[in-house]
Amino acid sequence: MKIAIYGGSFNPMHIGHEKIVDYVLQNLDMDRIIIIPVGIPSHRENNLEQSDTRLKICKEIFKNNKKVEVSDIEIKSEGKSYTYDTLLKLIEIYGKDNEFFEIIGEDSLKNLKTWRNYKELLNLCKFIVFRRKDDKNIEIDNDFLNNKNIIILENEYYNISSTEIRNKVKNKEDISELVNQKVKKLIEKEYKED
């Protein structure tokens, strides 16, 4: 089975995130995608909205998609979340006979060498890298450009930022075109104040 793992803060999840999931399912022949809202990120300050809110939003968006699972594996774990540790847990749960893929943005690929056990990660899974429209000039390490376990997709996903959505909600601006309508009211309620 081909399993893609899509971790992120999803603070909140938006149409751009959904387009990535749709693209991977439709074009990369995945059997399953596991969406993982991060608990305490290893590479950022912990200024995330409540974990249960982010998890609830993700679950609502994908509740009718049998190929998408929303997991609380990182939210439930104590301490900082590291992709390597999460992947090992998922391999234990689903079995090492499956083929695992990690979905990341090009900005994350640029910093991949700073990730915990990144070399082992590259042996355990393949990376599907999406390019941001505004990140065309990011320099990618030659080790990654020539690595068979890193798939860089030239297509561009929607250039939407969760920060932009949070700011619009605080300023009582319309977010209809940025988020799934199933969760619009929930996002407006939960993100109206910090």
Regions found by a protein language model. Give the residues of each.
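Nucleotidyltransferase catalytic core that binds NTPs
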Residues: 1-194
